[in-house]
Amino acid sequence: MNNKTTLVVMAAGMGSRYGGLKQIDPIGPNGEIILDFSIYDAVKAGFDKAIFIIRRDIEKDFREMAGKRIENMIDTEYVFQDMDYLPAGRTVPQGRTKPWGTGHAVYCARDKADTPFALINADDYYGSSSFKLICDSLKNSDEMCMVGFKLGNTLTENGTVSRGVCETENGYLKSITEHTSLDRNSGIPLDTIVSMNMWGLTPKVFEYVERDFTEFLDNMQNPLKNEFYIPTVIDNMIHRYNYKIKVLDCTKKWYGVTYKEDRETVAKAMREKIGKGYYNGI
């Protein structure tokens, strides 16, 4: 039984498709952002602390538009995803400006996340049941896990999306394959389990993140563009080190803003939830 659990939030993404800092784009009727709803759900589920992984250049805006409210809801810490925070002996390739990716974000949190933790994207709405599923699993088991959503519950009408398509066996993750340009006509069954980067991890993961990140840096084909993703670490843990990653099935809808046009869909969904009595006192 693990008494303490932490929520680690990846909020440093540049939002290239959306064209702005979507993490701090108001979505609720009273100026709430998606993150407000996620933190509310996380606190209700039983998480004790939140760690935000951000870029230094958005710190002021992030604290102003999100941090101040969130700090009233939960114990909060910040971690900077600095380009030059790398394993010993490694340096940023000359001319590189692109962030290193989600695997590097997790690497940056290694000195702060000292309890079992859930990892999420700041700009995704996962829903209260997802946070309950993952918090209960982290508290009652030492197994790492992920929340799996049905592909059809994660698509947008406004364009194609990238998803980590999962193969499962007896309730555990067998493989995860990144598919780009998915929509309802891609030929993949809509009830296929996909990952939306909602992982339940323990501090043990950091040794694998560092090992794989070092290997990635030493073998980059394109030093200016290649990115290091957390699913790569998970896949290696399963296939190289025989780790078992439990899959927690979520049948609810996921919401996110991949395109600007998605914003109204998400805002409408949040208005409806608030109208039904969810998120009182947020």
Regions found by a protein language model. Name each.
Residues 2-67, 74-76:
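N-terminal glycine-rich phosphate-binding loop and ensuing alpha1 helix
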